[in-house]
C-alpha cells in the first residue's frame, strides 16, 4: 500500500507549553489534526476554568488553520473543588481533568498527594460527565521506576474504578502489558492512550550503546515484551485504545544535560510514526480506528467529517526544529520518515 486515506485524526494528549514556543508547537499540532487535548501542566498549572480559557486563547492566537480546535483540561490539585469541575464542564471548552500524582512527571509538583482528598471532585466529575485523565504512576521512593505503573494500577486506579463505576477514565500513555490487561478487563468506561514512541522504542533503544536523552520520557520506556503488548493493543482495532502522542518538547539543552528533562517530541510527524508501526504489524487498516474513531467515540464527541491522506514518500526529519528562541530535537532527528501526510 502506498496511499492511505483516513478520517482526519485527533491527538488526545499533547503538551504545547506556553509563551513564545506556542508559535512552533501549535504549528506542528495543527498541521493535520482536527482536535488536540491540551495538557494543563504548564507553569503555573491550569487549575481553573478561567486559566483554561485564557490558555486556549493564547493557543488560538497561533492557529493558522481552519480545521484545528484545542480541547482544554484542568489540572487537579488537593484543593480543586466540585464547583470548579461544574464550572469547567459548563464552559464547553474543558472536556477533562488530569490527575497527576505529585512529583510524577514534568511540572507535577502541584499534583494530588492522596487520591482520597479529591473523591468529592471525582464524584462531581462522574455526575456532570467530565472525563478523568490519569498519569498512572506512583511516586513513592520505595517503588522502582520501572514498576511505578503496575503499582499505580493495583493500589490507586483499581479502587477509583470500583468506587466511581460511571466515571469515564483515560489511562494516559500506557507503557506495560499490565496496563493493557487492566484496560481490557475494566468496564466500558475505562480506556487508554498510547504514544508513538512507546510503540517504536523500548528501554534498550534508550540505554544500549550510550544514553539517548531524547528517548527519556515518563512513564519511562519499558522492556521489549511490554512494547510488543502495546503494539498488539494499538493495532488490534479494540475501541478502548486510541491515539495520544504525549508529545512533550524541551529545549535541546534541557534534554542533553547532567539532569535531563523527561519528554519526547513527536508532534512534527506523529501520524507518520504511527503509520510505520501499523504497517510493520500488518494492520494499516486499523490505523483509522485508532487515530480518528476511538477517541471521539469514547469522549462522546462527533468524529471529524473530512479526511487526510498518507502517502509512502520518504522525507528527512531535521536535526533540530525551532522552539521559541531555542531549538528542540524531535524524534527521528536526522533520519528519514517512510510516510508523509499530503
From Swiss-Prot:
Q: Which InterPro entries match?
A: Amidohydro-rel, DHOdimr, Dihydroorotase_CS, Metal_Hydrolase
Identify the keywords attached in UniProt to this record, alphabetized. Hydrolase, Metal-binding, Pyrimidine biosynthesis, Zinc
Q: What is its EC number?
A: 3.5.2.3
Binding-site list for Zn(2+) 2:
98, 135, 173
GO BP field = 'de novo' pyrimidine nucleobase biosynthetic process; 'de novo' UMP biosynthetic process
Task: Describe the subunit structure.
Answer: Homodimer.
Its annotated function is as follows: Catalyzes the reversible cyclization of carbamoyl aspartate to dihydroorotate.
- Name of the molecule in the record: Dihydroorotase
The organism of origin for this protein: Vibrio vulnificus (strain YJ016)
Q: What is the lineage of its organism?
A: Bacteria, Pseudomonadati, Pseudomonadota, Gammaproteobacteria, Vibrionales
Amino acid at each position: 500500500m502506498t496511499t492511505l486515506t483516513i478520517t482526519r485524526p485527533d491527538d488526545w494528549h499533547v503538551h504545547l507549553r506556553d509563551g513564545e514556543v506556542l508559535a512552533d508547537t501549535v504549528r506542528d499540532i495543527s498541521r493535520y489534526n482536527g482536535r488536540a487535548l491540551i495538557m494543563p501542566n504548564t507553569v503555573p498549572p491550569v487549575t481553573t476554568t478561567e486559566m483554561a480559557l485564557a490558555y486556549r486563547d493564547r493557543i488560538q492566537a497561533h492557529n493558522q488553520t481552519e480545521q484545528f480546535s484545542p480541547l482544554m483540561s484542568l489540572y487537579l490539585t488537593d484543593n480543586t473543588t466540585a464547583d470548579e469541575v461544574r464550572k469547567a464542564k459548563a464552559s464547553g471548552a474543558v472536556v477533562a481533568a488530569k490527575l497527576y500524582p505529585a512529583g510524577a512527571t514534568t511540572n507535577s509538583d502541584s499534583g494530588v498527594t492522596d487520591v482520597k482528598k479529591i473523591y468529592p471532585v471525582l464524584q462531581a466529575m462522574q455526575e456532570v460527565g467530565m472525563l478523568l485523565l490519569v498519569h498512572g504512576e506512583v511516586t513513592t521512593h520505595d517503588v522502582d521506576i520501572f514498576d511505578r505503573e503496575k503499582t499505580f494500577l493495583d493500589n490507586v486506579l483499581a479502587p477509583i474504578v470500583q468506587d466511581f463505576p460511571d466515571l469515564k477514565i483515560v489511562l494516559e500513555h500506557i507503557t506495560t502489558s499490565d496496563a493493557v490487561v487492566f484496560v481490557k478487563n475494566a468496564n466500558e468506561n475505562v480506556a487508554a492512550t498510547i504514544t508513538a514512541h512507546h510503540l517504536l522504542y523500548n528501554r534498550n533503544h534508550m540505554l544500549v550503546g550510550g544514553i539517548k536523552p531524547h528517548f527519556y520520557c515518563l512513564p519511562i520506556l519499558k522492556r521489549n515484551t511490554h512494547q510488543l503488548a502495546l503494539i498488539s493493543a494499538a493495532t488490534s482495532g479494540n475501541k478502548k485504545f486510541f491515539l495520544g502522542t504525549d508529545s512533550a518538547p524541551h529545549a535541546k539543552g534541557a534534554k542533553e544535560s547532567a539532569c535531563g528533562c523527561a519528554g519526547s517530541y513527536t508532534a512534527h510527524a506523529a501520524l507518520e510514526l504511527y503509520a510505520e508501526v501499523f504497517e510493520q504489524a500488518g494492520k494499516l487498516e486499523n490505523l483509522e480506528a485508532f487515530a480518528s474513531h476511538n477517541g471521539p467515540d469514547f469522549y462522546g464527541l462527533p468524529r471529524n467529517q473530512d479526511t487526510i491522506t498518507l502517502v509512502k514518500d520518504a522525507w528527512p526529519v531535521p536535526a533540530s526544529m525551532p522552539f521559541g528562541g531555542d531549538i528542540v530535537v524531535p524524534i527521528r532527528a536526522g533520519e528519514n520518515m517512510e510516510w508523509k501526510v499530503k
